[in-house]
Amino acid sequence: MMLTNRQIRVRLFESLKNSFFKKTVGISFALLFILLITAFSLIVVRFEYKLQLNEQKNLILEDTRLDEQWSQIVLEYSSLATPTAVEKFAQKEKMTLPTRKTIGFLNEQKEELNNE
């Protein structure tokens, strides 16, 4: 018995339709769909991981740079507080040590102001 092209197409379509609604084929398609979702999720997660890793590296570099700046600032302040630096500043501003006559106590000054 010879089948026509139309009959072959109809039987093939019915065969696909019947097999598609079977449990095994439905489960296979569901698993394929889950597999594709998982693969795309993995791609997204790895991309986000690389972005976060790059951000972490940038933050570590910035932390190192800020630590170096902090060390420089601490060194500058400590060098400004040395006795020689203070003495040079005092000479530049023409400062002198106070004499006994120029030293006054705050309590005495308040009393003088109150008496006036």
From Swiss-Prot:
Family annotation (InterPro entries): Cell_div_FtsL
Topology Cytoplasmic: residue spans: 1-24
GO biological process, one term: FtsZ-dependent cytokinesis
Gene Ontology cellular component terms for the protein in this record: cell division site; plasma membrane
Stretches assigned to the Periplasmic side: 46-116
Residue intervals passing through the bilayer: 25-45
Membrane topology annotation: Single-pass type II membrane protein
Function: Essential cell division protein. May link together the upstream cell division proteins, which are predominantly cytoplasmic, with the downstream cell division proteins, which are predominantly periplasmic.
Assembly: Part of a complex composed of FtsB, FtsL and FtsQ.
Family classification: Belongs to the FtsL family.
Name this protein carries in UniProt: Cell division protein FtsL
Species annotation: Francisella tularensis subsp. tularensis (strain SCHU S4 / Schu 4)
Gene field: ftsL
